[in-house]
């Protein structure tokens, strides 16, 4: 088996046999293998591979005359490979990949399962995340895609990826054991979840993620996860909003200095405080006047009836309110904001074309068996303490994803690995920490 040098490296200069990314535009990239004697052609020009050997990664390479084009030669990364790989299936992009990697807790030296290799976009990212000491076990049921992916992984030097041709929904994950995380990109992930439980580690908290484009798939997946003992089930959709930067014209000062902006903010805060004090003062004066009017109304007037007193009250109230009305322009002097002299400049605008919905990501956590048994025992005891004279509706199997409201899972989640090991070794069923 011919395994080439690793695809992901930190070398400075381009060498023969390297895989490089030719960057033409943000949505136009091509991956090539540097082979002496060959030439890359595109609408911008021609680029002999011999001309690229020895150049620094990131260099701007111009096409020989008469073509005026140029390309940037970039060092490959999983992110760039995702944007330039040959599509054999629908692939995952960086927003989903990064979120899945974070939620699964993929770490250096870890062991993860990927079911549904496809074009290998997720596989390359997982390979980099686990590092040389970790392992990615990837499964693909389609024979032709499996063979193509196997050759690709070998040529890219992904020695920590173990690819197998297997239908995991029917045959399971084989001898895979001690796995910390599982990612299922399958049409029917609920058929593979029972097999995934057998491959997960039983002594630590493990996680699973299911990638499904339709809500009907999500509902079936959630039902299966609950039946298999998973907790903290949640579903998210990751959307990205692309913005384009607008370059201001040259030799212009559209942006103010930091000192001027800081000075403006300080003056604004000072005016806001003065306005607040003025409002407090005005409110106190109004309350004092209202109390004075009420006190005058309470004094009995000789020879006058109460109805006559009420008829005269509007004229008195109007004369009292005239003074604040006349003095309002004076108080408004502190309320008036000075005109904003800062120029308004557009520096960014939303891209006219952006990717929309890809799929729904359903995550769940599987606690160690001893923890789950203690949680079930505590739930049972709490049910026994519940008064029996309350008539409850029969429980139904709901497919709505919800979150635990109890404090037990929160306590377990707050444990460190050492506290978790000590608690499990003690054999205690009490979760009071």
From Swiss-Prot:
Its main location: nucleus. It comes from the Eukaryota. Heterotetramer; composed of two copies of TRM6 and two copies of TRM61. One of its GO terms (biological process) is tRNA methylation. Its EC number is 2.1.1.220. Keywords: Methyltransferase, Nucleus, S-adenosyl-L-methionine, Transferase, tRNA processing. PROSITE patterns: SAM_TRM61 (PS51620). It catalyses: adenosine(58) in tRNA + S-adenosyl-L-methionine = N(1)-methyladenosine(58) in tRNA + S-adenosyl-L-homocysteine + H(+). This is tRNA (adenine(58)-N(1))-methyltransferase catalytic subunit TRM61. PANTHER family: TRNA (ADENINE(58)-N(1))-METHYLTRANSFERASE (PTHR12133), TRNA (ADENINE(58)-N(1))-METHYLTRANSFERASE CATALYTIC SUBUNIT TRMT61A (PTHR12133:SF2). GO terms for cellular component: nucleus; tRNA (m1A) methyltransferase complex. Residues 328-348, 380-391 have a biased composition (Polar residues). Belongs to the class I-like SAM-binding methyltransferase superfamily. TRM61 family. Catalytic subunit of tRNA (adenine-N(1)-)-methyltransferase, which catalyzes the formation of N(1)-methyladenine at position 58 (m1A58) in initiator methionyl-tRNA. S-adenosyl-L-methionine binds at residues 92, 119-121, 140, 145, 167-168, 185. InterPro entries: SAM-dependent_MTases_sf (IPR029063), TRM61_C (IPR049470), tRNA_MeTrfase_Gcd14 (IPR014816). GO terms for molecular function: tRNA (adenine(58)-N1)-methyltransferase activity. Pfam families: GCD14, TrmI-like_N. Residues 394-409 have a biased composition (Basic and acidic residues). It is found in: Nucleus. Residues 295-353, 380-409 are annotated as: Disordered.
């Amino acid at each position: 088996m011919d395994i080439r040098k690793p695809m992901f490296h930190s070398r400075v200069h381009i060498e023969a046999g390297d895989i490089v990314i030719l960057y033409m535009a943000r949505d136009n990239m091509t991956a090539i293998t540097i082979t002496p004697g060959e030439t890359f052609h595109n609408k911008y020009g021609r680029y002999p591979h011999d001309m690229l050997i020895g150049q620094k990664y990131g260099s701007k390479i111009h096409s020989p005359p008469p073509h005026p084009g140029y390309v940037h030669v970039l060092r490959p990364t999983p992110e760039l490979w995702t944007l330039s790989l040959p599509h054999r299936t629908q692939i995952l992009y960086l927003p989903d990949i990064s979120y899945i990697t974070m939620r699964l807790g993929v770490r250096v030296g870890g062991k993860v399962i990927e079911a549904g290799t496809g074009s290998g976009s997720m596989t390359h990212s997982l390979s980099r995340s686990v590092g040389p000491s970790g392992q990615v076990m990837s499964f693909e049921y389609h024979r032709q895609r499996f063979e193509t992916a196997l050759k690709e992984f070998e040529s890219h030097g992904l020695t920590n990826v173990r690819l197998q041709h297997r239908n995991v929904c029917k045959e399971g994950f084989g001898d895979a054991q001690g796995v910390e995380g599982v990612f299922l990109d399958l049409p029917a992930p609920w058929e593979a979840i029972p097999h995934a439980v057998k491959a997960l580690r039983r002594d630590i908290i493990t996680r699973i993620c299911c990638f499904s484009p339709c809500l009907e798939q999500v509902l079936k997946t959630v039902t299966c996860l609950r039946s298999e003992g998973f907790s903290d089930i949640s579903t998210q959709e990751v959307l990205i909003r692309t913005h384009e930067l607008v370059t201001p014209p040259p030799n212009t000062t559209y942006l103010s200095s930091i000192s001027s902006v800081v000075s403006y903010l300080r003056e604004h805060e000072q005016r806001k405080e003065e306005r607040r004090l003025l409002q407090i003062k005005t409110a106190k004066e109004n309350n004092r006047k209202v109390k004075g009017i009420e006190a005058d109304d309470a004094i009995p007037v000789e020879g006058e009836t109460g109805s006559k007193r009420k008829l005269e009250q509007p004229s008195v109230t109007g004369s009292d309110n005239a003074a604040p009305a006349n003095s309002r322009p004076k108080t408004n002097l502190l309320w008036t904001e000075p005109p904003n002299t800062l120029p308004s400049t557009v520096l960014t605008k939303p891209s006219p074309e952006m990717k929309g919905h890809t799929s729904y990501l359903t995550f769940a956590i599987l606690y160690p068996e001893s923890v789950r048994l203690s949680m079930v025992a505590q739930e049972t005891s709490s049910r026994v303490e519940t008064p029996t004279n309350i008539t409850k509706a029969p429980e139904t199997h709901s497919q709505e994803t919800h979150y635990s409201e109890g404090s037990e899972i929160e306590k377990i989640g707050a444990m460190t690995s050492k506290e978790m090991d000590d608690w499990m070794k003690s054999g205690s069923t009490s979760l009071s920490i």
